[in-house]
Amino acid sequence: AEYWNHNSAYHPWILRQITGHSGLAALDVGCGEGLLLQRLSPYCTTLVGIDPDPSSIARARRRLPQATLLTQLFDDLPTDQSFDLITMVASLHHMELEPTLHRVRQLLRPGGQFLVVGLSARKSVADWVISALSVPVASIGSALHREARDIGVQVAQPRESLAEIRTAAAKILPGARIRRGVYYRYLLSYQRPA
C-alpha cells in the first residue's frame, strides 16, 4: 500500500535524480517494506533491498517478488557486488558514518549515484533554530498528506550534526552535495566519477 511520511515525501526527489536512466542496478539500504524500490523499478533491471528487520523484508517480498530482498546489515553486504544507484532513506544515521561512506564508494560503479534522505542531530544554535522554523511546514505537510506515523520500522536518534556529515562527506565523497530539506531532513547526492 502507498503511504506518506517525512521520508517518502522525498521519493520524488530521488526519482528526479535518475530520470532518463534505465537498466540500473539499484541497492536500497534500509529498504523497509520496499515502497522506494517499487517506485525505482521502472528504471532498474536489478533491485536489491536490505534491512535488518525480518518483518519489514517479509512485507517487501510481498510488494516486490522480483527483487532480491535480504535481512542483513549494510556492513555484511559482499563487496564483490556493484551498483549504479545506492539509496538510503532515514537509514544512514543507524550506521557508523565514515565506514559506511567508504563502503558506499567501494560498491558504487563509475558514474553511479548515492542518494540520501537523512536525519542529523541538532547540536548548534543554527540547527535548533532551523528545526523550530520547520515545525509549521512539517505540521501542515503531515496534515495535508495524512501522514502515516508508524509504519512498523525501527527508529534511532541521529548522532552527527549536519556540519559533521558535511565534513565526512567532503573527505570521503568529494563533490557530494548536501542541502537541508523540510520535514527535518537533509538531502545528500553524490556521483562517483566515471
Tell where the protein language model's regions lie, with residue ranges:
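Class I SAM-dependent methyltransferase SAM/SAH-binding core
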Residues: 33-35, 39-76
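Conserved Class I S-adenosyl-L-methionine
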Residues: 155-191
